[in-house]
């Protein structure tokens, strides 16, 4: 069927139990969420199990239990690859030290890379480029999020760069970075 043609990415820590997006590091809530998603997606495997939205080193310290859960499911064959979603180079670098990551979901666009705007423009240009190179050197792929900065880069009035970029320019900018395997543009 169709499942063999798709790659499924689940974020451990994204919580929809209240009917809207939420974030949690509670292991029981995460287990319940993952079980619910597997059941509703009618699958027993997760191609990419992501430690979700860890942007502060203090959150990473709290999230070790979640990472252990992902690794446990990987040992059982439920999760195939381990990932991390973050906007913070220091957090990604810290987890790269553990040698457990296969993929990182990271925000890449010219505004963020050159600190031109947005709450997710974390880290300086050199720190961010060093991270991309490290991921490539260590065989950890990068899946890009926020390539359009939530649409801001596509509109001259909202672009922190002072001019509008095209979708093609934003996607190509991200694809040209070391380690980048794919760009996931947002949907409106």
Description of each model-found segment:
Residues 28-38, 69:
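Short, well-ordered amphipathic alpha-helical segments that serve as non-catalytic structural scaffolds
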Residues 36-58:
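Active-site groove signature of glycoside hydrolases
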Residues 1-12, 44:
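N-terminal binding-site loop/beta-alpha segment at the start of enzyme catalytic domains
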Residues 8-10, 47-50, 84-85:
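Beta-strand segments within the central parallel beta-sheet cores of soluble alpha/beta enzyme folds
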């Amino acid at each position: 069927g169709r499942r063999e043609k798709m790659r499924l990415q689940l974020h451990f820590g994204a919580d929809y139990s209240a009917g809207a997006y939420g974030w949690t590091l509670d292991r029981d809530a995460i287990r319940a969420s993952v079980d619910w998603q597997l059941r509703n997606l009618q699958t027993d495997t997760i191609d990419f199990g992501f430690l979700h939205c860890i942007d502060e080193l203090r959150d990473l310290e709290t999230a070790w239990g979640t990472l252990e859960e992902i690794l446990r499911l990987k040992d059982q064959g439920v999760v195939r690859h381990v990932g991390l979603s973050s906007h913070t180079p220091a957090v990604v670098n810290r987890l790269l030290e553990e040698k457990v990551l296969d993929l990182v979901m990271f925000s890449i666009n010219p505004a963020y890379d050159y600190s031109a705007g947005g709450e997710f423009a974390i880290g300086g240009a050199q720190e961010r480029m060093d991270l991309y190179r490290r991921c490539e050197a260590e065989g950890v792929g990068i899946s890009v999020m926020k390539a359009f900065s939530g649409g801001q880069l596509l509109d001259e009035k909202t672009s922190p760069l002072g001019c509008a970029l095209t979708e093609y320019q934003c996607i190509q900018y991200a694809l040209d970075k070391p380690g980048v395997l794919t760009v996931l543009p947002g949907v409106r």
